[in-house]
Amino acid sequence: MLQNTQEEASAICIRTLDNVPVAFLHYTEALSGTGKKAMKSSGASYAVPLANAETISADIRRAREQGAAVVVVSLNWGTSGTSKPTNAQRKLAQAIADAGADVIVGAGTRVVQPVTWLTHKNADGTAAQTLCAWSLGSLLNESRKDGNVAGMLLQLQISWDGQNISFGQVSYTPTYIWRQKVDGAYQYRVVASDQSAPNGMSEEQQGYMAKALRTIQNALADSPITIRTK
């Protein structure tokens, strides 16, 4: 997510969803050498918010001060192709939870990683939990590696009584990146891999889709999350 100005980079994104003010914060764990040089040469050090505990904690505090009842932190992080979070991810996630985030949503590894609850304490000393989805996998890309064609959409039910929030159902929709050739050119379509195959999908592609679903289910086997049923 690129920020065009310093003011834009400093602003907290808060959207009201079903009368609940929700803050959305996004950060990137690391940049390529090319990206770093581009930011330095342009003087736009604010263009890509980098993930560090101090910055994120400060932004969470500002979000709360501006009225956010729910804080969602999304991160591009981790090691591509790995099915488990790194120690650095775990350390940062716990710091984000301790700072008061309610949900952490990761991407960047290209493959689905587990979902877990992180425990921390509120300012008043009461216990609280943060939902952490380490990586949602791939929603859309050109790669045809097995894990890279699988992803998931996260669905959360969150209630707010004016003071505290509580989680209801935590579920997901597994997805598959279907590639087919039409008039000599490849077309890509994202489909729910737990549903019936769409018209025109070959038996071979149906087999790949079933394999993608198994990959997701294996990754989430011990996670507190279920496939969405409606």
Go through each PLM region and give its residues.
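Acidic, metal/ion-coordinating pockets
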Residues: 1-230
